[in-house]
Amino acid sequence: METFCIETLASDTYGKALNVDLDRLSQAQIKYTLQELISYCSALTILHYDYSTLAARLSVYQLHQSTASSFSKAVRLQAAQSCSRLSPQFVDVVYKYKAIFDSYIDYNRDYKLSLLGIETMKNSYLLKNKDGVIMERPQDAYMRVAIMIYGMGKVVNIKMILLTYDLLSQHIITHASPTMFNAGTKKPQLSSCFLLNVNDNLENLYDMVKTAGIISGGGGGIGLCLSGIRAKNSFISGSGLRSNGIQNYIMLQNASQCYANQGGLRPGAYAVYLELWHQDIFTFLEMPRLKGQMAEQRLNAPNLKYGLWVPDLFMEILEDQIHNRGDGRWYLFSPDQAPNLHKVFDLERSQHENAHREFKKLYYQYVAEKRYTGVTTAKEIIKAWFKTVIQVGNPYIGFKDAINRKSNLSHVGTITNSNLCIEVTIPCWEGDKAEQGVCNLAAVNLAAFIRENGYDYRGLIEASGNVTENLDNIIDNGYYPTEATRRSNMRHRPIGIGVFGLADVFASLKIKFGSPEAIAMDEAIHAALYYGAMRRSIELAKEKGSHPSFPGSAASKGLLQPDLWVRCGDLIPSWEERVAQTTQGVLTRKSWRQLRLAAIQGVRNGYLTALMPTATSSNSTGKNECFEPFTSNLYTRRTLSGEFIVLNKYLIDDLKEINLWTEAIQLQLLNAGGSIQHILDIPAEIRDRYKTSREMNQKILTKHAAARNPFVSQSMSLNYYFYEPELSQVLTVLVLGWKKGLTTGSYYCHFSPGAGTQKKIIRNSEKACNADCEACLL
């Protein structure tokens, strides 16, 4: 008699084993019984994280009962469907090498997924038939992605297919969501991020609505620059009429986003960007709001994300106004009367009259010529921005000049906007030989390199190199929705390697966020990430050639990403010694010197690193998001897959070591909403290490960002967390970040309670109480 025993799936230290006689149940009853057990175990997660592990394994078991037992069979069943998404070429490769793939794939690795991970895979990544029935297992999806990367070209590279499968299935790396759910299909749009620049003519305005919709339908997130659109009531010489400005156009894109969801798997996602000198800036800042005059009149567009492209000049004027050194006067323009302000930037931040400050020069030239259409103050703009941030958490802030002056591709053109999450910064333009920016993303699991004797920087370097090669192949194998996206990606070959699990690293090694050791390690980890990517990109250039826009790039002159920071005065030259010390000699001055010399000969990719939010990737692997601290030690995570209790297992393990994980502590943790700061029975040293993102001084997040940013080719999705919506606190970190040379000022500003947060009741089946829940914003 077959008996299903929970004790064989996970240790149950708090309850007795539950045995179910499967022979006496129908398939429907088995499914129902398993689902009951999964829900029951999930509700008990507050007692111990092993219950969540148990629920995850039950969920995997349930999936395995309804899916094919071999990879080739899963592909065959999908290919036989009348509306199969799989490409014939992919199916042919699988059939040809099915003996290798079937024998290599390890379905037991599915049981390593967290509950949040397996449910995310089921709902977002695993291919389904037309009736919504899941047709593959997580391991099948990983193999599908690996074959897409290394099996769809002229040569089927079995060795790299199996290596990539191992890296994915062992959760050492993750690829972006579009890659996961489009790999191997007839229309494999594998890229995550697209950047569009909207021109000020009717044809292009509507072209960009169409282009954005097509991209969104394939799973891509979109960033649009609106700074070139003439302001409201501007004269249109061709028709003799007046312009509607950006408001109606934003509403049009808002409607398009709602319609063109990402392949039916998640809502469409657009971000619109505007520079602060634009006459319509106050309209722009009000459009995201859920309350206010525009919202009441339904003239808002709350489904979009918003971003500000902020020049140094504005920050200088704002700082002077804050400290009563100036009146804060800020001039507003319409781009038809004051052209090209969004196409120039300040190469230097110096106040010297001979400094290379093209934006400042042109701005004041237009002021002198009285081309401005309005006058306000820097404070008024910031107050309007903050009023919106309190409601919805954005607009984001990107520091325009820092982004451009520290770009390896600054010779290509001015970067006018970013993407959905403000970590991708690729030049884009419309018109003759238009280029629409594209970036392919992946992330490395930093926790995978924790060792008993410290941290494995060599392993991280190697993994970063492997991801670099993966992403470079994706550029060649992917589908492009427009010729302008293909042209841009082939010319610059940008990739964006991010990270997740930094908080897991610090917790495992008992290092406190904000400590000198943590900041040094943050710097060293991202130095290793960048080094590994650059080294492999140089090797690929020797084999396949450099990206076409390599001549004139910073790398072609022997300048690495941190060198651009040194040149700007935002990084001291002794950084190499510091990294050498932290990595214990893995990366030395000689390492970087050799890398510079090699880069001059050629680099395959124009960009290498970009630190994205990694919400879904982190969910699927059970690690903390990107480079962030823990948002709470106990909360409910709301995703497209449902709601899941998340318990900080590192805290539990530390408390168990000193016999403090008791029912009394559990209740206090619940009542405190996941905080341990006022649980005085817990030693101060542990309380200090497990401060959540809201509980630590936000300057700590800025200092960490400043440590890692010199090794980021593009930018980062930098969040801040505040208890109260106080403008002075937010301005403190924004100004500090700007002075430290950060490329991103802010992604989301979270307030408690505020945008993206809620109170959620969690407890076992008998009792419940409140705890904070950090909802996924992507």
UniProtKB/Swiss-Prot annotation:
Its EC number is 1.17.4.1. One of its GO terms (biological process) is deoxyribonucleotide biosynthetic process. The record marks 193, 439 as: Important for hydrogen atom transfer. Substrate binds at residues 177, 192-193, 221, 419-423, 613-617. Disulfide bonds join 193-439. GO terms for molecular function: ATP binding; ribonucleoside-diphosphate reductase activity, thioredoxin disulfide as acceptor. Induction: Expressed in the early phase of the viral replicative cycle. Pfam families: Ribonuc_red_lgC (PF02867), Ribonuc_red_lgN (PF00317). The record marks 747-748 as: Important for electron transfer. It catalyses: a 2'-deoxyribonucleoside 5'-diphosphate + [thioredoxin]-disulfide + H2O = a ribonucleoside 5'-diphosphate + [thioredoxin]-dithiol. Keywords: Allosteric enzyme, ATP-binding, Deoxyribonucleotide synthesis, Disulfide bond, Early protein, Nucleotide-binding, Oxidoreductase. It comes from the Viruses. It is an enzyme of class 1 (oxidoreductase). The record marks 773, 776 as: Interacts with thioredoxin/glutaredoxin. The record marks 200, 230 as: Allosteric effector binding. The active site is at 419 (proton acceptor), 421 (cysteine radical intermediate), 423 (proton acceptor). SUPFAM superfamilies: PFL-like glycyl radical enzymes, R1 subunit of ribonucleotide reductase, N-terminal domain. InterPro entries: NrdE_NrdA_C (IPR013346), RNR_lg_C (IPR000788), RNR_lsu_N (IPR013509), RNR_R1-su_N (IPR008926), Rrm1 (IPR039718). Coiled coil: none annotated. Under complex allosteric control mediated by deoxynucleoside triphosphates and ATP binding. The type of nucleotide bound at the specificity site determines substrate preference. It seems probable that ATP makes the enzyme reduce CDP and UDP, dGTP favors ADP reduction and dTTP favors GDP reduction. Ribonucleoside-diphosphate reductase holoenzyme provides the precursors necessary for viral DNA synthesis. Allows virus growth in non-dividing cells. Catalyzes the biosynthesis of deoxyribonucleotides from the corresponding ribonucleotides. Belongs to the ribonucleoside diphosphate reductase large chain family. Heterotetramer composed of a homodimer of the large subunit (R1) and a homodimer of the small subunit (R2). Larger multisubunit protein complex are also active, composed of (R1)n(R2)n. This is Ribonucleoside-diphosphate reductase large subunit. It comes from African swine fever virus (isolate Warthog/Namibia/Wart80/1980). The lineage of its organism: Viruses, Varidnaviria, Bamfordvirae, Nucleocytoviricota, Pokkesviricetes.
